[in-house]
């Protein structure tokens, strides 16, 4: 019996908006299909809001969500977004990754 596993490559990008540097950690990550994945955005200053985007290979960035409130948590199916209490960081968690999750994820503040 042949077992085939898919390797997902999820990229993150560094963003700079209005002079604020927002850094994502890790910058890229290989994930096996079915594994969970988490990436973080950290800002040097307090953000009034943060947006998350996804760009599929060869495609344009697609808006996913905007977080405004301190400590806010929002879910979209297998994706969970969180805005830190101090409004200087955010996280994106994908549960049980699928091949449709392949792409570049980035945040902007």
UniProtKB/Swiss-Prot annotation:
Keywords: Adaptive immunity, Cell membrane, Disulfide bond, Glycoprotein, Immunity, Immunoglobulin domain, Membrane, Receptor, Signal, T cell receptor. Glycans are attached at residues 42, 89. Residues 20-109 form the Ig-like domain. It holds the Pfam family V-set. Residues 1-19 form the signal peptide. One of its GO terms (biological process) is adaptive immune response. It is found in: Cell membrane. It comes from the Eukaryota. Alpha-beta TR is a heterodimer composed of an alpha and beta chain; disulfide-linked. The alpha-beta TR is associated with the transmembrane signaling CD3 coreceptor proteins to form the TR-CD3 (TcR or TCR). The assembly of alpha-beta TR heterodimers with CD3 occurs in the endoplasmic reticulum where a single alpha-beta TR heterodimer associates with one CD3D-CD3E heterodimer, one CD3G-CD3E heterodimer and one CD247 homodimer forming a stable octameric structure. CD3D-CD3E and CD3G-CD3E heterodimers preferentially associate with TR alpha and TR beta chains, respectively. This is T cell receptor alpha variable 25. It comes from Homo sapiens (Human).
């Amino acid at each position: 019996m042949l077992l085939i596993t898919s390797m997902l490559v999820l990229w993150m990008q560094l963003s700079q908006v209005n002079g604020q540097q927002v850094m994502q950690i890790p910058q890229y990550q290989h994930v096996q299909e079915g594994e969970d994945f988490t990436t973080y955005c950290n800002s040097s200053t307090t953000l009034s809001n943060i947006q998350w985007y996804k760009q599929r290979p060869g495609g344009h960035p697609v808006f996913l969500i905007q977080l405004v409130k301190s400590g806010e948590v929002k879910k979209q199916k297998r994706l969970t977004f969180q805005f830190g209490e101090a409004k200087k960081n955010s996280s994106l968690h994908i549960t049980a990754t699928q091949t449709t999750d392949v792409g570049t994820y980035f945040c902007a503040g």
